């Protein structure tokens, strides 16, 4: 059954391999949770604060983050399938070694975000602030940064395979 949590004060969460499914979190503050290796399926986070969360190695399927704060979150080594980030603040978030399929980033503030060694398939960036974002050793083929701010973006060498097929 679906669970809805609205503006619920949550205690510090420290659990590994936690399963969350068919849930909506609205206006919740998660005080720097540690949920490494957890699984999220059919979950919506709306106006939630997940700043400084450690969600490394997590799996996200059909998850929406709407107007959330993920500042400084460790999201490395995650698997992201059919996920939407809409108008989120994600400065200094770390997505290193992530695998992304069918993911959309829209209208987000993503300054200094790390996307090192990521794999992208059907990923879209729309109206994002990617100032100083890092994409080293990440193939950017098929991506479009046409309507996003990419000042100071860091990638591999200008002649490297990483830039082939990128639209700016």
List PLM regions with ranges.
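Tandem repeat scaffolds
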Residues: 1-168
């Amino acid at each position: 059954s679906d669970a809805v949590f609205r503006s619920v004060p949550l205690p510090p969460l420290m659990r590994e391999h936690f399963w969350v499914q068919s849930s909506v979190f609205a206006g919740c503050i998660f005080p720097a949770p540690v949920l490494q290796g957890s699984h999220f399926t059919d979950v919506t986070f709306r106006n939630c604060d997940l700043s400084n969360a450690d969600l490394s190695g997590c799996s996200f399927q059909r998850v929406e983050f709407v107007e959330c704060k993920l500042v400084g979150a460790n999201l490395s080594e995650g698997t992201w399938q059919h996920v939407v980030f809409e108008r989120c603040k994600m400065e200094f978030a770390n997505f290193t070694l992530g695998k992304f399929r069918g993911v959309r980033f829209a209208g987000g503030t993503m300054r200094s975000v790390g996307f090192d060694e990521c794999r992208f398939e059907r990923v879209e960036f729309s109206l994002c602030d990617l100032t100083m974002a890092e994409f080293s050793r990440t193939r950017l083929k098929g991506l479009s940064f046409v309507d996003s701010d990419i000042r100071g973006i860091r990638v591999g060498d200008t002649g490297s395979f990483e830039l082939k097929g990128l639209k700016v």
